[in-house]
Amino acid sequence: MSANTGYTIFETFVGAGGSHIGFIQENFRTVYVNDFIDDCLKTLVYNNPNLIEEGAYIDNTSIDKIDAVALRNKLGVTIGEIDVFFGGVVCKGFSLAGERNPIDERNYLYHAQLNLVNVFRPKISIIENVPGMRNAKVLVGDDEDLRSEIEKLWQALENYKGKKAALRKINKINKAFEDEGKTLKKRKELLLKRLQNSPNYISVVEDIKRLYEEMGYTVHMDVLNSAWYGAATKRSEE
């Protein structure tokens, strides 16, 4: 089925198309979809052959490697022509599960998304993520010593988790090992307290809002539950 609404959609972090299917069902015409995982794109195209029929550009370039101006020229669209930009930016670093590394490279991918928005200037731009994004912060600036300290500590935490899982299987966790974990946890707490007092430790949501407003967009933020829109699960997204 070909799109017939006249509206266009440009989506990044498309995955296998969980969000994109909504636009297809509403007969949006897909101009561009991006994900760096080939199998995701193959699944998306297999389930939606109309994407090829309509000439959608299927791109597996990592979003932080995209030349936005060159892409706009390749697509042959003008500034402000695209109706909707949608990006479910990677959420691993913002999820309430896990260690939430403050310098996780994935935490900064929204900058690449907003660079695309700045170059294309769509009529509507949507960034979707987990509710944990509301409390997420990232470290900016060039304090290499602090970054190195964070990287080493978070690597030690990951190594400890892996070793703990292995020892649990053979019932070999002892008090000394548990004390090591408590020490790492305390070091993490102290480091996070230091970060909270740093002017370079900034709110992700406030940074996104600032960047949008600098481009002239009016920003609305809310947490939506997928069950409100017919999904079989009660899953909240921002």
Q: For each predicted feature, which ranges?
A:
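Acidic active-site catalytic centers that drive phospho-/nucleotidyl reactions
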Residues: 11, 35-37, 62, 128, ...
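Short, solvent-exposed loop/edge-beta patches enriched in aromatic
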Residues: 26-28, 52, 85, 118-121
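Generic enzyme active-site microenvironment
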Residues: 9, 33, 86, 126-127
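Short, glycine/acidic-enriched loop or turn micro-motifs at the edges of active sites
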Residues: 14, 38, 65, 91, ...
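S-adenosyl-L-methionine
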Residues: 45-77
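Conserved S-adenosyl-L-methionine
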Residues: 2-58
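Class I S-adenosyl-L-methionine
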Residues: 69-82, 89-237
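Short glycine/serine/threonine-biased micro-segments
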Residues: 13-16, 85-86, 130
